[in-house]
Amino acid sequence: MATLFIADLHLQTEEPAITAGFLHFLQGEARSADALYILGDLFEAWIGDDDPNPLHHDMAAAIKALVDSGVPCYFIHGNRDFLIGKRFARESGMTLLPDENVLELYGRNVLIMHGDTLCTDDTGYLAFRAKVHTPWIQTLFLALPLFIRNRIAAKMRAGSKAANSSKSMTIMDVNPQAVVEVMEKHRVQWLIHGHTHRPDVHQLTANGEPAHRVVLGAWHSEGSMVKVTSEGVELIQFPF
């Protein structure tokens, strides 16, 4: 058996091929898993669980079908869908997890997270993140009419795209020291995360021993998953 991890699908109505690929994954590979973990940015944007977007409800139904088949599904918020709440979790059958979570998998302790908090050199983003994660700001935003939330979200996405275009690739990647610190805080030798869209397996030293950081790829032209079994940890890219 295996435990599967995915992240950064950025599902949206404008990208039906990615949606179809995700549905195929849920109905195929995922059905034989011990569990599925989605490490953030399942959706390109999320303005509230009350958004009537048919895509959201279709995906909730598809995930619920997986859960009902006996495969539990867990979710860590990303920087695009951090407002996913208990209502969508109930509809989809997913279990919401904290930003940093340690799993015991086949004899390994594995830290999982979205990965945006590791990009500590991007101080502008971290300042923005702190603001939008403030509870009263979220409460105020979710109280606004949907059409206003849509406008705000669109403006924020455009601003983020413009800001990122002028940032160096190094700034938008993880800070190596931040990686070591979080692994040592949780006393783990394995870390799986997404966010950077740079799939790879990195070797490092943490807790005075060899350690491994596995980065999931984004679902653009192909799918990306990490498969953890009793035999090892594998990063896999696959066609939709």
UniProtKB/Swiss-Prot annotation:
It is found in: Cell inner membrane. It catalyses: UDP-2-N,3-O-bis[(3R)-3-hydroxytetradecanoyl]-alpha-D-glucosamine + H2O = 2-N,3-O-bis[(3R)-3-hydroxytetradecanoyl]-alpha-D-glucosaminyl 1-phosphate + UMP + 2 H(+). It is a peripheral membrane protein. GO terms for molecular function: manganese ion binding; UDP-2,3-diacylglucosamine hydrolase activity. It comes from the Bacteria. Its EC number is 3.6.1.54. GO terms for cellular component: cytoplasm; extrinsic component of plasma membrane. Hydrolyzes the pyrophosphate bond of UDP-2,3-diacylglucosamine to yield 2,3-diacylglucosamine 1-phosphate (lipid X) and UMP by catalyzing the attack of water at the alpha-P atom. Involved in the biosynthesis of lipid A, a phosphorylated glycolipid that anchors the lipopolysaccharide to the outer membrane of the cell. Belongs to the LpxH family. PANTHER family: UDP-2,3-DIACYLGLUCOSAMINE HYDROLASE, UDP-2,3-DIACYLGLUCOSAMINE HYDROLASE-RELATED. This is UDP-2,3-diacylglucosamine hydrolase. It comes from Enterobacter sp. (strain 638).
